[in-house]
Amino acid sequence: MHTVKLLCVVFSCLCAVAWASSHRQPCHAPPLTSGTMKVVSTGGHDLESGEFSYDSKANKFRFVEDTAHANKTSHMDVLIHFEEGVLYEIDSKNESCKKETLQFRKHLMEIPPDATHESEIYMGSPSITEQGLRVRVWNGKFPELHAHYSMSTTSCGCLPVSGSYHGEKKDLHFSFFGVETEVDDLQVFVPPAYCEGVAFEEAPDDHSFFDLFHD
């Protein structure tokens, strides 16, 4: 009888933990983050790698591709003001700018409010000092894009670790390295003067952050 009671208590506790985990509210990114972001296709092709800066309060994002590790004639430099729905493609070498509307404003730098908490796991070892990282895994859908996503953040601090995007036209994997809770120069979120007066180029309603990355 005591064994049955004990099993019932254990089962109830496990159910409570599982319920709490599944109903965990999405965490919020720190006010400022910066570091290295690498994007690859699920086929293993390196698409982009460079430095990112993110202002979570203003919802502004800057990504500058690392020119030293890309065999290309042009390199990505984008500034996105998600709240305003504006995407700038910047060419600092030629001082030119392209400005597009961005109707779909969700992205993987911030966990969407309707994301589901999947699990909390250790990467590496949980028992050896400084040899492990506890992360939370979130997932959800972007119905407008006919896509779904998964994101991993640090358990404490909500720093980005990795993310994946699976859509009808592409599959992407994002990795984040050397993430800091600061941005050295806040001017990275301000479009250059030569972007002023540039006319908007209309984009489809499903134009998104994820369209930036392709083979």
UniProtKB/Swiss-Prot annotation:
Signal peptide range: 1-20
Designated name of the protein: Ependymin-1
GO terms (BP aspect): cell-matrix adhesion
InterPro entries recorded: Ependymin, Ependymin_CS
A GO MF term: calcium ion binding
Keywords attached to this entry: Calcium, Disulfide bond, Glycoprotein, Secreted, Signal
Organism: Carassius auratus
Domain of life: Eukaryota
Assembly information from the UniProt record: Forms disulfide-linked dimers.
Family classification: Belongs to the ependymin family.
Function: May play a role in neural plasticity. May be involved during axon regeneration.
Pfam family, one: Ependymin
Intracellular or extracellular location(s): Secreted
Post-translational modification: Different glycosylation variants are known as EPD-beta and EPD-gamma. Binds calcium through the terminal sialic acids.
